[in-house]
């Protein structure tokens, strides 16, 4: 769900919000856990 930037310290939170609560950054991509 969207890109992940290592320079953004809030990326993990943004990724989780993008996924609706559960999501993690794997390299340059934000992936949602189902």
From Swiss-Prot:
Keyword set includes Secreted: yes
Location of Arginine amide modifications: 34
Disulfide bonds: 1-18, 4-25, 15-30, 19-32
InterPro entries per record: Scorpion_toxin-like_sf, Scorpion_toxinS_Cl_inh
UniProt entry keywords in alphabetical sequence: Amidation, Chloride channel impairing toxin, Disulfide bond, Ion channel impairing toxin, Knottin, Secreted, Toxin, Voltage-gated chloride channel impairing toxin
Task performed by this protein: Chloride channel ligand. Potently and reversibly inhibits CFTR chloride channels when the channels are in the interburst closed state. May also interact with chloride channels (probably ClC-3/CLCN3) and MMP2 at the surface of glioma cells. This complex may be then internalized via caveolae, thus inhibiting the chloride channels necessary for cell shrinkage and tumor propagation.
Family recorded in the similarity comment: Belongs to the short scorpion toxin superfamily. Chloride channel inhibitor family.
Name of this protein: Toxin GaTx1
Source species: Leiurus hebraeus
């Amino acid at each position: 769900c969207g890109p992940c930037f290592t320079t953004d310290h809030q990326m993990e939170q943004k990724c989780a919000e993008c996924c609706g609560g559960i999501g993690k950054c794997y390299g340059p991509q934000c992936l949602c856990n189902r």
